[in-house]
A protein has these predicted regions:
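Conserved SAM/SAH-binding beta-strand->alpha-helix loop
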Residues: 112-116
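N-terminal auxiliary segments of SAM/dcSAM-dependent transferases
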Residues: 1-37, 44
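Class I SAM-dependent methyltransferase Rossmann-like catalytic core
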Residues: 11, 30-80
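Substrate-binding/catalytic lobe of Class I Rossmann-like enzymes that use SAM or dcSAM, i.e.
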Residues: 203-287, 291, 295-304
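Conserved SAM-binding loop of SAM-dependent methyltransferases across substrates and taxa
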Residues: 89-104
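A short, conserved alpha-helix within the catalytic core of class I
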Residues: 166-180
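Conserved class I S-adenosyl-L-methionine
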Residues: 79-88
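Conserved beta-strand signature within the Rossmann-like core of class I S-adenosyl-L-methionine
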Residues: 182-200
Length: 324
């Protein structure tokens, strides 16, 4: 069978988690919302626009770096099993699949994502384009459901790209790396991790506060997602986007700041939330890394760096990782 799908989260479970996350986040100090709620259909389209902006270097830099290292990577390491965490539409995977399925070589692709419809559409396209490919999709949350990834069919390459690990705080980064280690049972298995590097503050802040205002719109869209999800009455026009680099924590922070006193009703939760003028909602952290910092995180998880590839400007790295 060329296509299987395992479902470990559904709309009901996702709704329950959203309600829990919103209640917890908006009754905390400081108030916060998880960045995964950026990505409804409108938010995903806005993020696609962000990746094309001149200020937003991560996507194009990672893509160019992947194209550069892939021939050597595949020459030394030809996987039978490819796992992609947070796969989305699987666009990043095509370069890898082009290389590993050359000559009709059989390969299994295991994408994990919370969006079942996107996974199904992606699987249909990939199966049509790669006759020797089989797909075993997993609908789930990468922070909860990595244990549901099926055992490997052979030598495995797991991929966690886009520096998505930077959206997690350090304890969550450590937990995730421990979970990722469990996906690499064989010493020959590898993990390819994309990491955004510490760099000039002006470059970092411009990437998250672009001149065209697309990131502003992306950030504000989370309020529309919450309104829809919990029957809220946030007024996005009453908040402004703020993004800055926290040097002490080595992270970009994105916030939505109330322009005036606000009272917001979240009817599905039976919750009223008040904002003082200038009070914010912390919507995203994006941690930036160094090689030494990554090596320390890996060591704590029982992993080690096999290769470290950096672009010429030292903006972004692809780390090839194995069991220690």
């Amino acid at each position: 069978m060329r296509y299987l799908i395992d479902v470990h989260t559904d709309e009901r479970a996702q709704q329950q988690r959203l309600e829990e996350d919103v209640r917890r986040g908006l009754t905390s100090r400081p108030k916060s919302l998880p960045p995964k709620y950026f990505y409804d259909r409108a938010g995903s389209l806005l993020f696609e626009r962000i990746t094309e902006l001149p200020e937003y270097y991560p996507t194009r830099t990672e893509s160019a770096l992947l194209a550069e290292i892939l021939p050597g990577l595949i020459e030394d390491f030809l996987p039978d099993d490819i796992v992609e965490i947070g796969a989305g539409s699987s666009e990043k995977t095509r370069r890898v699949l082009d290389a590993v399925t050359a000559g009709g070589r059989p390969v299994r692709y295991v994408p994990l994502d919370v969006d079942r419809l996107t996974l199904e559409a992606s699987a249909e396209r990939l199966l049509r384009e790669y006759p020797s490919l089989s797909v075993h999709a997993v609908v789930g949350d990468f922070e909860r459901d990595l244990a549901h990834v099926p055992p490997p069919t052979g030598r495995r390459l797991a991929m966690f790209l886009g520096s998505t690990i930077g959206n997690l705080d350090e304890p969550a980064q450590r937990r995730l790396l421990a979970d990722l280690k469990a996906l690499l049972p064989d010493p020959r298995d590898r993990l390819l991790l994309g990491v955004d590097l510490v760099k000039d503050v002006k470059i970092l802040e411009a990437a998250y506060d672009d001149s065209a205002g697309v990131t502003r719109d992306f950030n504000l869209n989370i309020l529309r997602v919450i309104n829809r999800g919990v029957d809220g009455d946030f007024d996005p026009d009453a908040f402004r986007h703020r993004a800055f680099y926290n040097d002490a924590a080595a992270r970009i922070e994105m916030h939505l700041v109330a322009e005036s006193a606000q009272t917001v009703r979240l009817r599905r939760l039976g919750l009223t939330v008040r904002f003082a003028p200038g009070e914010g909602i912390w919507t995203e952290s994006s941690y930036k890394f160094s090689r030494a910092g990554i090596e320390a995180l890996l060591g704590d998880a029982g992993l080690r760096l096999a290769r470290w590839h950096v672009d010429p400007a030292n903006y972004f790295a692809l780390a090839l990782i194995q069991r220690a």
